[in-house]
Amino acid sequence: MQVKETVADGLKREFEVNVPAADIDAQVDARLVDLKDKVKLNGFRPGKVPVSHLKRVYGRSVAAETIDKLVRETNDGIFAERGFRLATEPKITMPQDQKVVEDILAGKSDLNYTVAIEVVPTIELADFKSFSVEKPVVEVSDSDVDDAIKRIAEANRAYADKAEGAKAESGDRVTISFKGSIEGVPFDGGTGEDIPVVIGSNSFIPGFEDQLIGIAVGETRTIKVTFPTNYASETLAGKPAEFETTATKVEAPQDTTIDDEFAKTLGMESLDKLKEAAKARLAAEYAGATRLRVKRQLLDRLDETHKFDAPPSLVEQEFAVMWQSINAEMQQNGKSFADEDTTEEAAREEYRKIADRRVRLGLVLSEIGEKNKIQVTDDEVSRAVIERARQMPGREKEVWDFYRSNAEALAQLRAPIYEDKVVDFILELATVTEKPVTREELYKDDDDKTAA
């Protein structure tokens, strides 16, 4: 066998490979000998079929199988000998001329093929002990807890029927039945019976709730609205519609007394227990935001200290996924690049930079994990699946079966766990300094940086 490197351009490599016909023929014969005791042919006793006869009957198919195996093993040897880690699957170019192919299968000609690859660059890892990270810390204050309790009370406030003939005001809850039409023609999903809506909640089409102000029980109104251009249904988006709407109930919001009795309506023993639960939830929320801030700093530091050319094919794949998502989102929201004060060309350039960063950081994190034997256990993956299942009550078995039968989905679930474990490993080595901040500072937008 002969191997000749013909391309060595950056991370791209290409090889011309020659496999002698004699090598192929020898492996075909070995395979036929192995099959001799397993094949049953009329006129021959088990195990007594001559190899020459087997070759006439099965030679072509066995040769094809052998060549496929030889190519895979040869390629693996080429890559292993040179210490290559592949960024993508190798591109193999086999002979296309039918006569040449037949001669190769018949053992009359050598096999000549080319294999092109893109390799992962050698990554020199930084000294993580030199990293410094600032950890923003927010203490959950009594006022934070009180505000959270007020929001809970607002979301769970009671309503009571208004006096007979009373008209609806902003903040009231009106129960309505309606029939919608466009140019006099009813449309799918345009009817509703006894639907409660709080005026001012902005839960209906823009302009709909405002036209309920002043309506009384038993009154019917024609409400005219225009569906937003970014409405989920393309058949309705941007179109004017009319809704014949009848109010069946008008209720006013009641003041909520925040006390033990209110807490009990939420399943808590007392107001103190409700406050404890609210404080714990806020603490978890702040901890999550803190984690994101710390991780952002760490990824930025990894980006700064690991500059190398990322495999172009991986960058292109990442960019393609991002670009498809961006375009779908813009189309759904009815926006253009001009609306975002940019051009398509500028946006492409910016997102290609982001794609390059993501690929490089992914390779760096993978290298760190590999060199430090960081692994995701089956138990950790199982816990992640269970958590996903909990988010879909009543469909737990469906979620479990989906991940059990979908290796790609399971890999997507495993990836962020692996990334977090690598991040935790680096944080153990880095210098982490806590900095007290306000809630507003913790959640302040950081538009000048892009997370991986």
Curated annotation (Swiss-Prot):
The entry lists its GO molecular-function terms as: peptidyl-prolyl cis-trans isomerase activity; protein folding chaperone; ribosome binding
**Where does it localize?**
Cytoplasm
Biological process terms from the Gene Ontology for this record are: 'de novo' cotranslational protein folding; cell division; chaperone-mediated protein folding; protein transport; protein unfolding
Which E.C. number(s) belong to this protein? 5.2.1.8
Query: Which UniProt keyword terms apply here?
Result: Cell cycle, Cell division, Chaperone, Cytoplasm, Isomerase, Rotamase
Q: Which Pfam families match?
A: FKBP_C, Trigger_C, Trigger_N
Reactions accelerated catalytically: [protein]-peptidylproline (omega=180) = [protein]-peptidylproline (omega=0)
Q: Which domain of life is it from?
A: Bacteria
Limits of the PPIase FKBP-type domain: 171-256
> What class does this enzyme belong to in the EC scheme?
isomerase
Gene Ontology CC: cytoplasm
Its domain comment says: Consists of 3 domains; the N-terminus binds the ribosome, the middle domain has PPIase activity, while the C-terminus has intrinsic chaperone activity on its own.
Cited function: Involved in protein export. Acts as a chaperone by maintaining the newly synthesized protein in an open conformation. Functions as a peptidyl-prolyl cis-trans isomerase.
Q: What family, per the record? A: Belongs to the FKBP-type PPIase family. Tig subfamily.
Protein name (record): Trigger factor
Organism listed in the record: Rhodopseudomonas palustris (strain HaA2)
